[in-house]
């Protein structure tokens, strides 16, 4: 999935590129990509640190979304398959 497809799927209204839902979806795509990279290159510690920063940023945005709009939080979690 490329960036435009992710934005179209999660945007709230036309032209929405910065809502919490879109940000979480884009971060999730980057996290998945970096995770695959680290499976091939396990000693790439620089990328591993970047991955940890992305995960932390996604966690903060999800916490914000959970507090502000629980319904949207549940929908995003379900669509992305993040929580069990």
Curated annotation (Swiss-Prot):
It comes from the Bacteria. Keywords: Ribonucleoprotein, Ribosomal protein, RNA-binding, rRNA-binding. GO terms for biological process: translation. Gene3D superfamilies: 6.10.250.3130, S15/NS1, RNA-binding. Coiled coil: none annotated. The keyword Transferase does not apply. InterPro entries: Ribosomal_uS15 (IPR000589), Ribosomal_uS15_bac-type (IPR005290), uS15_NS1_RNA-bd_sf (IPR009068). GO terms for molecular function: rRNA binding; structural constituent of ribosome. One of its GO terms (cellular component) is cytosolic small ribosomal subunit. One of the primary rRNA binding proteins, it binds directly to 16S rRNA where it helps nucleate assembly of the platform of the 30S subunit by binding and bridging several RNA helices of the 16S rRNA. Belongs to the universal ribosomal protein uS15 family. Part of the 30S ribosomal subunit. Forms a bridge to the 50S subunit in the 70S ribosome, contacting the 23S rRNA. This is Small ribosomal subunit protein uS15. The gene is rpsO.
